[in-house]
Amino acid sequence: MSTGFNAQSFLRTVSSSAGVYRMYDVKGDVIYVGKAKDLKKRLSSYFRKNLGNVKTQALVSHIHHIDVTLTHSETDALLLENDYIKQYMPKYNVLLRDDKSYPYIFLSQHEHPRLAYHRGPLREKGYYFGPYPNGGAVRESLHLMQKLFPIRQCDDLYYKSRTRPCLQYQLSRCSAPCVGKVSNAEYDEQVKLASLFLKGKDKQVISELVAKMEEAAEQQAYEQAARFRDQIMALRRVAEQQEVSGNTGDMDVIGVHYASGIACFHLLFIREGKIFGSRSYYPTVPAQTDIEEVLRSFLLQFYLNADIQRTIPKEVVISHHFEELHELEAAVSEALNKKFSIKTNVRADRASFLRLALTNATNAVMTRLSHKNTVEQRFVLLEEILELNAPIQRMECFDISHTMGESTVASCVVFNREGPHKAEYRRYNIEGITPGDDYAAMKQAISRRFDKIDASGKIPDILFIDGGLGQLRIAQQIVDEKFVNLDKAPQLIGVAKGESRKPGLETLIFGDTESSFSLEDDSPALHLIQHIRDESHRFAITGHRNRRQKTRNTSTLESIPGIGPKRRKALLQHLGGLQEVKGASVAELAKVPGISIEMAQTIHDALRG
């Protein structure tokens, strides 16, 4: 492929200084960002006669022009390169697609502080513990905290509305400060102990509780002493389950395994010498990328992520050494304005943690490769059965979900040769049709999917329709209209359930000929079709349920004059749900913040009809 780029002419203008270069394709998209200590030397290497790397050959064949930015130092170049990669997400760079902010446990600054799950900017006044590797780890920790420390986890609106203890008090998971079941001093003491525990100082917590238990026993307050005893026993059980290292402090331990184009970075988050959590990352790696670039790109993007800068430890231990390690240390230290070191040759506890991280990374890659190979085999068998001339690169499946015609949602899921490609999934809220008309819903969904399709768009090789011949005919009609001027169109296949609707009894129908066929119930090709069909059904029904719930809550309350989103939210939170709002008296409605007695009467009358 020729793009008209004159490399020799361009190289004559390039400086030998440090800097960053951006490579563009003919459409003006940035396809690669790189940095160099000597730009002229680095860029010249792309245009040698013998390029051994397939990735580099493919990259060079698409270059239309190159922009260069000079920097004061190699460290500055490294930081600017990272900024450009985040900005442009070039297809030939290693990309860490991890745009979620990290979750925390939040302890509020309130007369009676609450513990809560938090994700997002740290704006509210209080104490933030974390970040945790994922939301599940936070929820698990909060559940544990309820058993150890009777501190409220309800929101402030619910707290203010209580006139008697809730179920959490009956379960001994909250001391009910909302209704005065505990003194402020006792509650504050539990908050202090919980805070120490979240900081990893469980030995100090146990020591303080032992002292309180002995004091209570001396004063013959045996019931209180028994509560402290139970709390101590629970804390000791938790402490015994945690792996502890005596002198490691705070650090991240990273095991790396890279094989067959799949890279896994398994991180152990060590805080106060304990495994605080773990998480695997799978950066997008272009084919033929060397391990040096994979390591450097991941570490730079991960540790300069704005969401985690507040809690980056000073020390990182990683399983692989690489050439630019010290330059990367300097760049991250400069960006964060704090000491940052990367170690690869470690002993004792650090070596033990590193072996654990590396084992997890290796197992993760092997599992992915096994899954990838299984999916690949299923694709090959499906291609043979369908007698296709070219490999299947993309499959899509549509499904419709509604309840008696209410809140109809269509789903489109996408599979490539590695399995589900969830970034490409789409949902369509269906509007303007007769409720329950699945044919009209399918027509609208397919029309919207291919409304602006052209030869450069993402055209599926196979398009599955979860339904019978009627829906398939509608879909085929729309596809014929949309692709009339294009050389390629998807092959439509309907997936009709058998009379008993049992898996394995599906009938498959070609959209163009309407001829049908079936596969053996143990056929791997059928399993692939069932997988994409089931995934489409799951994605559709989840979207439908979410839309239905939102519609029911919103339309019922917001149709009442004077009730907007804020008052609707206050009513639902304060009273616990729509049914509770419907069953509430005027007096109960008037207790909700922002609801006057007149407004309460209006709501009561509207909901009671």
UniProtKB/Swiss-Prot annotation:
One Gene Ontology cellular component: cytoplasm
The yes or no answer to whether the keyword DNA repair is present is yes
Domain GIY-YIG: from-to ranges: 16-94
Q: Which GO terms describe its molecular function?
A: DNA binding; excinuclease ABC activity
Its Gene Ontology biological processes? Answer: nucleotide-excision repair; SOS response
**Cell compartments where the protein resides:** Cytoplasm
Q: Which Pfam families match?
A: GIY-YIG, HHH_5, UVR, UvrC_RNaseH, UvrC_RNaseH_dom
* Annotated ranges, domain UVR: 203-238
SUPFAM superfamilies, sorted: C-terminal UvrC-binding domain of UvrB, GIY-YIG endonuclease, RuvA domain 2-like
**Primary location recorded for the protein, binned into one broad class:** cytoplasm
Q: Which UniProt keywords apply?
A: Cytoplasm, DNA damage, DNA excision, DNA repair, Excision nuclease, SOS response
User: Does this UniProt record's set of keywords contain Secreted?
Assistant: no
Describe its partners and assembly state: Interacts with UvrB in an incision complex.
Q: What does this protein do?
A: The UvrABC repair system catalyzes the recognition and processing of DNA lesions. UvrC both incises the 5' and 3' sides of the lesion. The N-terminal half is responsible for the 3' incision and the C-terminal half is responsible for the 5' incision.
Give the family this protein belongs to, as stated in its UniProt record: Belongs to the UvrC family.
* Alphabetized PANTHER family for the sequence: UVRABC SYSTEM PROTEIN C (PTHR30562:SF1), UVRC/OXIDOREDUCTASE (PTHR30562)
Q: Tell me the protein's name.
A: UvrABC system protein C
State the organism of origin: Shewanella sp. (strain MR-7)
Please name the taxonomic classification of the source: Bacteria, Pseudomonadati, Pseudomonadota, Gammaproteobacteria, Alteromonadales
Name the gene for this chain.
uvrC
